[in-house]
Amino acid sequence: LDSFIDIRRSYAHVYEKEFSNIEGIILPKTIDEVKHARHLFPIILDTDKLTINRNEFMEAMKKENIGTGIHFPSLIGTHYYSKTYNYKEENFPNATFVGERIVSIPLYPKMSVEDLRNVVDAVKKIINYYRKKWSTGLVH
């Protein structure tokens, strides 16, 4: 078990290094004093800076032969919470923001280094392709 955790941590470190300066991705925060098992590697898509939403990103990843998942949906908008407690998504903007944008990318101990590189390359390719191109505001 410890060796699997070490591998996942190592791969998570690669993701953090590769994606840390990519505009359009928000990475999970880590605390140095906490020994995280890195069971999953979720990223948040900053859709204000992209021309695609999470579902379109997931479809683009699928076309690159890379699976993704939604492991942390917001519970605020579910039938139970809306009916039982009268919760409305607009009253929980942070949960709604994350719930609509979070996606898990592959992270498992049997991944090869080539698999890891393929995930990194695919994420960068898709994010770079769909990043909003900011205009200068000048009229041509």
Predicted regions and their residues:
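PLP-dependent aminotransferase class I/II
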Residues: L1-H140
